[in-house]
Amino acid sequence: MQARLLIPILFSVFILSACGTLTGIPSHGGGKRFAVEQELVAASARAAVKDMDLQALHGRKVALYIATMGDQGSGSLTGGRYSIDALIRGEYINSPAVRTDYTYPRYETTAETTSGGLTGLTTSLSTLNAPALSRTQSDGSGSKSSLGLNIGGMGDYRNETLTTNPRDTAFLSHLVQTVFFLRGIDVVSPANADTDVFINIDVFGTIRNRTEMHLYNAETLKAQTKLEYFAVDRTNKKLLIKPKTNAFEAAYKENYALWMGPYKVSKGIKPTEGLMVDFSDIQPYGNHMGNSAPSVEADNSHEGYGYSDEAVRRHRQGQP
């Protein structure tokens, strides 16, 4: 009865041990990106921007204000990827019966003594303490078998998060301007705009997963872009577009069997869960909107898109 219970318990321990997914929490970047990561980051950004509903801005001249969460950093995975070797080691040895026979040499000593007409004869038999011959016989067959599994664990993750990469911000801003242009919406400077459009990029990075389940293994790289946007009419301070959220995830996955392969590689993009907190349910105090528009960071105003607080202030005061 105990043996019947022990077998499934041992089998379950073997199957479940070292099975899991290690998920780092890196920001993308930190050195030269490889092509797959570039493709995923660009795809998620393009999908999020392309899905923006801008119909309410048709025929208007808009000024864009884009703020991006810090997204540059570095990360590395070390260790992991088990190999069938020897951590759980069992050994069975079947040894044959062995018999050894020894033959020791013997020698005889004779001594004769004569004294006063008396003669004595002494004879002794001795055996040397070293065999002159040994014979070993083995009966039956012998065998030896072993089984082992070496598990390197799921590895160690190290990451470093830095500041926003200006080139990433520039790329994302150019995507936004491209979509606005293709939708027939004019993007102009704040001095010539009748509408302000604010875009907050909350998530713009990658996630790497490693899954180890003995027979099945997988490496997964995901890129996510999550943004919230809204538009304000400068004349009456009304919201032309209430706060809306777009979130997309692009993924690249390699499937392995015993870490041999990959036997399958897949790529895809899909909408993902939105922001943990958004502003879609915020209502103004009273019956009027505020007189001041949100501002963006000064270091986000470069190359003709996005404007600093000082530029917005001068425009509202009528200064050049």
Swiss-Prot record:
GO terms for cellular component: cell outer membrane. The keyword Chloroplast does not apply. Coiled coil: none annotated. Residues 1-18 form the signal peptide. Keywords: Cell adhesion, Cell outer membrane, Lipoprotein, Membrane, Palmitate, Signal, Virulence. It is found in: Cell outer membrane. It comes from the Bacteria. GO terms for biological process: cell adhesion. A lipid is attached at C19 (N-palmitoyl cysteine). A lipid is attached at C19 (S-diacylglycerol cysteine). Residues 288-320 are annotated as: Disordered. Its main location: membrane. It is a lipid-anchor. Belongs to the MafA family. This is Adhesin MafA 1. It comes from Neisseria meningitidis serogroup A / serotype 4A (strain DSM 15465 / Z2491). The gene is mafA1.
